[in-house]
Amino acid sequence: MLKMESTQQMASSIINSSFEAAVVAATSTLELMGIQYDYNEVYTRVKSKFDLVMDDSGVKNNLIGKAITIDQALNGKFSSAIRNRNWMTDSRTVAKLDEDVNKLRIMLSSKGIDQKMRVLNACFSVKRIPGKSSSIVKCTRLMKDKLERGEVEVDDSFVEEKMEVDTIDWKSRYEQLEKRFESLKHRVNEKYNHWVLKARKVNENMNSLQNVISQQQAHINELQMYNNKLERDLQSKIGSVVSSIEWYLRSMELSDDVKSDIEQQLNSIDQLNPVNAIDDFESILRNLISDYDRLFIMFKGLLQQCNYTYTYE
């Protein structure tokens, strides 16, 4: 008959998967914290601690034992299952209790409270005597059951053994924290000094830019003043030209209507805006040239009617 160990193999696979998950969780946590690490070293440390906690807490043996019981029942050996049926009244309740017990065992093992300390604390309790420095050691029900089952031995050759408890070297921990603090302080100072230099350079560039802007503004002001002077000079020149033309017009032997028309055109010149004044001068010149052209045509027609000829010299 083929022997089935599928449940036991599944339990072992779950334990191994839990270890791999612990390694992945540890390495990913170190990566998120930005801590450099050696994967082999992390793997070895996690494996050592994981094996210690699983073995010392009894979780591994508990899971494997239950898996073996199930495999035996599947193989037709119901003795273990029948023996455990008396206390397995409710599988869900028992599973929840086992889960809670396993969590407590793992938590105690991770805190350095090994199996020896847990058994001793479960077997004995201490009762203080009021008013005295001594105390009474009391045996618990578990100790009584162990005595009845013959699980208690007396070691006549007592050898004091040092209990293996994880201790914390606070001095080295403080030195590590101090080194980390100094390293962080050094990085912060470097960043601050770099920021100060950068801010100083930006300030210098800003001052230089302000100086350039001030120089450009001064140059713009000079050009504006020069432009205003040119505009005033042009306005003055335009006014003097208009006055000179008006004076010259009055000295001419022209009819009053012609003088009045020319004066109106001169008075329409915009003396405040040189650009408009030039346009007005252009219009007046065009009108004068047009009048001269019409006058020449009239004179030419008159000569032809009188049978005269004309020449340009």
From Swiss-Prot:
Pfam families: Rota_NSP3. It comes from the Viruses. Residues 170-234 are annotated as: Interaction with host ZC3H7B. The lineage of its organism: Viruses, Riboviria, Orthornavirae, Duplornaviricota, Resentoviricetes. Residues 1-149 are annotated as: RNA-binding. GO terms for biological process: regulation of translation. This is Non-structural protein 3. Residues 166-237 form a coiled coil. It is found in: Host cytoplasm. Keywords: Coiled coil, Host cytoplasm, Host-virus interaction, RNA-binding, Translation regulation. GO terms for molecular function: RNA binding. Residues 208-313 are annotated as: Interaction with host EIF4G1. Plays an important role in stimulating the translation of viral mRNAs. These mRNAs are capped but not polyadenylated, instead terminating in a conserved sequence 'GACC' at the 3' that is recognized by NSP3, which competes with host PABPC1 for EIF4G1 binding. The interaction between NSP3 and host EIF4G1 stabilizes the EIF4E-EIF4G1 interaction, thereby facilitating the initiation of capped mRNA translation. Belongs to the rotavirus NSP3 family. Homodimer. Interacts (via the coiled-coil region) with host ZC3H7B (via LD motif). Interacts with host EIF4G1. Residues 150-206 are annotated as: Dimerization. GO terms for cellular component: host cell cytoplasm. Its main location: host cell. It comes from Rotavirus A (strain RVA/Monkey/United States/RRV/1975/G3P5B[3]).
